[in-house]
């Protein structure tokens, strides 16, 4: 049986963490509906991986750079990126982060200290190593 040790986390902190886990799951579920309806062209679902993205992001300071991958929606929501602009990004709108050039997670945002991802997943590690050493 798995044991949970809350250590020094208050009820409020645990509730906030749960909300941060729930938001990307709700968005993921909606995006899969939109994909099936043909309203978006692609979606790389991260359902079941929310705790990885949210936990890693919450363990970092807001001014530390993070290098997410395409299934790490929780990074973007935990860094409080505006949902309206995220949805414009995924729809390829001019108002999205990449100004309509693509509809995925390949964008970064310096304001939120998020590095844009590379399609080939392995090379992202070298970038993270360089940032950590800088």
Regions found by a protein language model. Name each.
Residues 1-41, 62:
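Cofactor-/ligand-binding subdomain signature composed of acidic, glycine-rich
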């Amino acid at each position: 049986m798995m044991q949970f040790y809350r250590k020094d986390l208050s009820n409020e902190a645990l509730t906030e963490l749960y909300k941060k886990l729930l938001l990307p799951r709700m968005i993921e579920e909606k995006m899969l509906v939109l994909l099936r309806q043909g309203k978006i062209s692609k979606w790389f679902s991260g359902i079941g991986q929310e705790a990885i993205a949210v936990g890693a992001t919450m363990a970092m300071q807001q001014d530390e750079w993070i290098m997410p991958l395409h299934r790490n929606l929780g990074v973007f929501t935990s860094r409080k990126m505006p949902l309206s602009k995220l949805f414009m990004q995924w729809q390829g709108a001019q108002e999205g982060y990449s100004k309509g050039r693509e509809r995925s997670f390949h964008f970064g945002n310096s304001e939120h200290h998020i590095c844009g991802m590379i399609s080939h997943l392995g090379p992202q590690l070298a970038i993270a190593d360089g940032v950590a050493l800088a």
